[in-house]
Amino acid sequence: GKTFAEVCAAGLNYLAQVYHDGTRVTYPLYSEEEIAAVPARAHAELYYCPAQQPGARFAIVLSGNALYYSGELRGGVSTAWELHEQGYAVFSLRYRIGWEAGDDAPLEDLARAIRFVMDNADTFGVSTEDYALLGYSSGGQLAGVFGNEEKGWGRYGVPKPGVLLLAYPINN
């Protein structure tokens, strides 16, 4: 198998290539007006790793962040590349964290990201059925909470995830 560094490099090289070929790979989740109202929203962003075939299922990767910073480029890129190799379109979410963001900010960002992908499914070439959430550490906790109808997907009015993959989720 490949080393972690080789997998990360392959993922970053792929993103650079699709960007060079004209595909947008970064998407802010909030408008300038929404960011002006809540400046912490500027941190929320999606990184897009397109599938090779249209109509692919999609996954959202939620990296861990030690509750202080987001690790989407470490865990997110390598996981995105591995899922891409399995036929998925993958989005790595940089979600808001920290005291200034507030307790529900990561859930709000995840719901916004899911809605954004669903609303733009044709642009991204993805199926809207049975999306996956894959989270590491605090991202795993976020995915797990979001899998609960009362606190997650149902509260935010988005479809229920088809699968949750929780890698060492933390518990506060």
Locate the predicted segments by residue.
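N-terminal carbohydrate-binding/catalytic regions of secreted carbohydrate-active enzymes
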Residues: H43-Y47, S70-G75
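Primarily recognizes the serine-hydrolase "nucleophile elbow" in alpha/beta-hydrolase
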Residues: R112-N172
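Catalytic nucleophile-loop/oxyanion-hole region of alpha/beta-hydrolase
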Residues: G71-G75, L93-T128
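Short beta-to-alpha linker loops that shape the active-site pocket of alpha/beta-hydrolase fold enzymes
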Residues: N65, R94-G98, I170
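Stable alpha-helical elements in mature extracytoplasmic
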Residues: C8-G11, G75, T79, P106-A113, ...
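Short amphipathic alpha-helix adjacent to the substrate-entry channel of hydrolases
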Residues: L73-F91
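N-terminal cap/lid segment of alpha/beta-hydrolase-fold proteins
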Residues: G1-P54, D103
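Short beta-strand element of the alpha/beta-hydrolase
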Residues: A56-N65
